[in-house]
Amino acid sequence: DALNYLIFQHDESTGKMILDEFNRPLRRDELYVDGLNCNPDTFDVECYECNEHFKKNRNRSEIKSHHYIISYDPADAIECDLTGEKAQALSLELAKKIFPGYQALIVTHTDGHNGSGNIHTHIVINSVRKEAVRRQSYMDKPHEEIAGYKHRSTNKFLNYFKKEIMDMCIQEGLHQVDLLSPAETKVTQAEYMAQKSGQKKL
């Protein structure tokens, strides 16, 4: 499940959990964990209870969670004194603003992809809003702010999210790219997965 992936080490090419000599999962070397509107240790149970309360996410085909990643520039740790603890605090405050009313796991790793060392934060939210909130600027459907409404990862929402990340980085004096401009070179999902598994070409 989501919590196991975020807490324990996994082989990046196979996705399988890495075990020690006693066949126990290896905890990640450094991580920071918080829960938003939930206890992180019981995130899955609390999400299930929320879904049942609102009679949502009962079919296998329904989207039950959304996973977002905030990836900080590797130079931030060297030049800007960014630590895993500081990134966790920043990301938690951002999550409170971006995902009000949702149950969420906020987990920061300091290892990066393939040991690159870039600090990054995972935000995993239950797709069903637990509590009603004030209507937000990106909401374009009626009643989108009410409890029980399912999260919609629309372009309007994503642009709002990206701008908030950029503003946070500027405010904190961190390196950041223009997330709202199209990338010069696009990488397909197949190319990304090939790179992740260590292949140079498809």
State where each predicted segment sits.
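N-terminal nicking endonuclease/strand-transfer module with a His-rich metal-binding environment
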Residues: 1-202
